[in-house]
Amino acid sequence: MANHNQENSQQSDMAEKLIAVNRVSKVVKGGRIFSFTALTVVGDGNGRVGFGYGKAREVPAAIQKAMEKAHRNIVTIDLKGTTLQHVITGKHSGSKVFMKPASEGTGIIAGGAMRAVLEVAGVQNVLSKAYGSTNPINVVRATVSALVNMHSPEGMAAKRGKRVDEILG
């Protein structure tokens, strides 16, 4: 019971953002059946981020399902203060994203779905660009995969059995 309350308190301090709501239809013999999809991201602003995609007959139910999935799919990323460790790229389906660390005071230079992911993850200074498909679902997946594949120099040095200054050159 105490563990469940601890999970609820952790979820309550997460920032939640709704990225997209879409009406979709299923065509049946009697006509069309409409339902709604929602894409959301959650994060603690300190390197933890997750996204969720929910579908239901009503908008609030779709958003609720998406938020629950986002809370279940949280990943941790290695940030360097308020920016990224190094230049990263990510790809999912037809979407490609490019992100580059920026100096203090630059802000989040990103569009649409990528901006929402970076904001809730706690990245405050970044230069980024989305190429190819700008479908929000694919852009979010590409952004999260790029962030997950980013590693700190300390982590890479430990993996390779070298010192940090050897890694950085």
Swiss-Prot record:
- Residue ranges of every copy of the S5 DRBM domain listed in the record: 14-77
Q: Which SUPFAM superfamilies match?
A: dsRNA-binding domain-like, Ribosomal protein S5 domain 2-like
Q: Which UniProt keywords apply?
A: Ribonucleoprotein, Ribosomal protein, RNA-binding, rRNA-binding
Q: Which GO terms describe its molecular function?
A: rRNA binding; structural constituent of ribosome
Keyword Ribosomal protein found: yes
Q: Gene Ontology cellular component?
A: small ribosomal subunit
What GO biological process term is on the record, naming one? translation
UniProt keyword Iron-sulfur, yes or no: no
Q: Which Pfam families match?
A: Ribosomal_S5 (PF00333), Ribosomal_S5_C (PF03719)
Query: What domain of life is recorded for the organism?
Result: Bacteria
Q: Which NCBIfam families match?
A: rpsE_bact
- Protein family according to the UniProt entry: Belongs to the universal ribosomal protein uS5 family.
Q: What does this protein do?
A: With S4 and S12 plays an important role in translational accuracy.
**What do we know about how this protein assembles, alone or with others?**
Part of the 30S ribosomal subunit. Contacts proteins S4 and S8.
Q: What is known of its domains?
A: The N-terminal domain interacts with the head of the 30S subunit; the C-terminal domain interacts with the body and contacts protein S4. The interaction surface between S4 and S5 is involved in control of translational fidelity.
Q: What is this protein called?
A: Small ribosomal subunit protein uS5
Question: To which species is this protein native?
Answer: Colwellia psychrerythraea (strain 34H / ATCC BAA-681) (Vibrio psychroerythus)
Give the lineage. Answer: Bacteria, Pseudomonadati, Pseudomonadota, Gammaproteobacteria, Alteromonadales
Gene responsible for this protein:
rpsE
